[in-house]
């Protein structure tokens, strides 16, 4: 089975659905990762956008090696992702590249602009994935993938439709979150600190707290929640989640 995880930035997937991807890996799925931006403005200490993007892509590739994932970077500007013909074509291309049975992605209602726009772009092109008159670098799909949004901003009060118990892979997920080392100085700076080690602990706690909250909802120790994308004529297959 092919699984495509789509995120807006490096580190989105590690916080939101790394446990699920690890369980997909362990059952033998083919995993694909696509990012709409490379997070090239996500630092106050790295001097240029180009250097920041290169560092963050390298961190993401390190994580993807743990998933055994193939990776595609769409490289739109961080904090500048818009709904255009160009971005739609790029997202359509990424979906066809992976030929997925299952897509995990940002929810379109996420208040972070790049997060929400990434989810919106996925939903906007979904009915075109099989269309022969929608050109891309890869052939049209012969099946409609099942789409589930990971539970992004917990402040939105969304109750997931389904949970994946990630208790057995939680430590590996935590280590993957900590792979995004470039973000420690960014987090420290926005919190008015220069203590990168404190920021590292915050990153670790954020990963564990989010996962523990999902576990409390799912009646297990640690879990990730997902919301099914319902589209006229298609129902996602819940059994595809591990």
Can you say where each PLM-predicted feature lies in the sequence?
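Active-site rim/loop-helix segments in enzyme catalytic domains that contact anionic ligands
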Residues: 1-98, 227, 233-239
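Metal-dependent de-N-acetylase/amidase catalytic core
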Residues: 1-4, 84-242
């Amino acid at each position: 089975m092919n699984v495509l995880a789509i995120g807006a930035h490096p580190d989105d997937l590690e916080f939101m659905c790394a446990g699920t991807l690890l369980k997909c890996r362990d059952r033998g799925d083919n995993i694909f990762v696509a990012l709409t931006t490379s997070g090239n403005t996500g630092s106050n200490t790295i001097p240029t956008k180009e250097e920041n993007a290169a560092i963050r892509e390298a961190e993401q590739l390190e994580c993807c090696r743990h998933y055994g994932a193939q990776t595609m970077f769409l490289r739109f500007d961080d904090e500048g992702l818009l709904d255009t013909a160009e971005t739609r074509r790029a997202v359509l291309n990424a979906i066809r590249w992976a030929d997925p049975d299952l897509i995990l992605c940002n929810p379109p209602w996420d208040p972070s602009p790049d997060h929400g726009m990434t989810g919106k772009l996925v939903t906007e092109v979904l009915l075109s994935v099989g269309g022969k008159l929608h050109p891309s670098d890869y052939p049209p799909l012969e099946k409609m993938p099942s789409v589930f949004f990971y539970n992004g901003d917990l402040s939105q009060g969304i109750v997931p439709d389904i949970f994946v118990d990630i208790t057995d892979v939680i430590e590996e997920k935590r280590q993957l979150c900590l792979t995004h080392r470039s973000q420690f100085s960014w987090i420290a700076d926005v919190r008015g600190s220069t203590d990168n080690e404190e920021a590292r602990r915050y990153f670790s706690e954020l990963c564990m707290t989010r996962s523990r909250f999902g576990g409390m909802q799912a009646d297990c120790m640690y879990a990730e929640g997902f919301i099914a994308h319902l589209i006229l004529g298609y129902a996602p297959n819940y059994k595809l989640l591990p």
